[in-house]
Regions:
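Short helix-adjacent coil turns
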Residues: 45, 52-53
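A short, structured loop/turn motif at beta-sheet edges
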Residues: 106-114, 144-151
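A short hydrophobic beta-strand element
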Residues: 111-123, 138
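Bacterial N-terminal signal peptides that target proteins for export
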Residues: 2-12
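Bacterial N-terminal signal peptides
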Residues: 11-22
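A solvent-exposed, acidic/Ser-Thr-rich amphipathic alpha-helical stretch
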Residues: 32-39, 54-109, 118, 132-135
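Short beta-strand edge/turn micro-motifs at domain boundaries
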Residues: 137-165
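Boundary at the C-terminal end of the N-terminal hydrophobic targeting segment
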Residues: 25-27
């Protein structure tokens, strides 16, 4: 029993030693203004998709962004990868009809932030005169980077939806 307690104290001490330099180097904690701006990025994400504003969506992401699509699909790197995944040339017209993004937690330091939460999206696709609808509820994780102008942009975006249980 004493051995387990001793190892537990060692593990806590090692964790603190490893984390403290990373926390110190991070530039402090998020300010209330940072958190408000990060929330606004997520609101604009909803708004731009619902308006069908592809340029508005692109503007929310860094040039070197990484999209991590669901189900282990390959990562899409940079604005080029974002365009290939979400806005491929010649793809059938797709309209987002519902998008609700609900951040559950926001954390980070003065330069990098993370946000995780839930989302619900619905869309229609029209091809050969036929319109089909689809939707899902899921989860997301975003990493954001503070820009030189003080605004925040999404650098990494990961999302998934529940797996059907049989």
């Amino acid at each position: 029993m004493k051995i387990h307690k001793a190892w537990g104290k060692v593990a806590v001490a090692m964790s603190l030693l490893l984390l403290c330099p990373a926390i110190k180097a991070g530039g402090g904690s998020l300010t209330a203004e940072d958190i408000a701006k990060i929330r606004r990025v997520h609101s604009r994400y909803e708004e731009t998709w619902l308006k069908g504003d592809a340029d508005g969506v692109r503007a929310l992401f860094t040039e070197d962004c990484v999209l991590l699509p669901p189900h282990g699909d390959k990562p899409r790197i940079g604005q080029k990868g974002l365009n290939e995944y979400w806005f491929p040339p010649g793809a059938p017209p797709t309209k987002i009809t519902k998008l609700v993004v609900v951040p559950q937690s926001i954390g980070g330091d003065g330069e990098t932030a993370y946000v995780w939460g839930t989302d619900e999206v619905a869309w229609t696709t029209t091809q050969d005169g036929k319109t089909t609808s689809a939707s899902h509820k899921g989860i997301f994780l975003n990493v954001l980077k503070k820009q030189a102008d003080g605004e925040w942009k999404i650098s990494h975006h990961m999302w998934d939806e529940p797996v059907e249980r049989h």
